[in-house]
Amino acid sequence: MEQKNRILRITRTAVLIALLVVLQAALMPLNNSLITGSIVNLVLIISVMTCGLSSGLCVAAVSPVIARLFGIGPLWSLIPFIAAGNAALVVLWHFIGNRSIGEKKYKARLAALFTAAFAKFLVLYVGIVRIAIPVFLGLPEKQAAVISNMFSIPQLITALTGGTVAFFLIPRLKKAIGGEKG
């Protein structure tokens, strides 16, 4: 039974990564980072909440690489920071969103939504805007400003948007896959 569950979790993780690839490719013509970012965050949250922490972390690490390969993401040197921001989102959704506050799971998921979104924003803002760009990258001022803008408030907005959609989808998905009743 343990082996079957492991295979199922790996398969679901692969499906979520494939979904991420398809969605990023499909959204590329829109050239709208708010839509793409929100959907990526949604997939990250769904992966951790339906498949577990290891699945969520796997998708979190693969996501920025896929984005860069599609030409969506910024510089290769920023991928570790982006993966760290994704990991913060995933870890907090896992540890907060899977808890019950009183009898209500929705309270924990609401707490996860806001806490994880802010944590991802903070990791990206500090890591990229305050450390990577001024200390390591030596970018021209105009390029530094564009990248700094990408990794500030828009990241909070996309994490909150993806989290809000996930908040409503998770109970239905878990019920559909047999992971949660009602």
Question: Where on the chain are the PLM-derived regions?
Answer:
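Loop-helix junctions at membrane interfaces
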Residues: 1-182
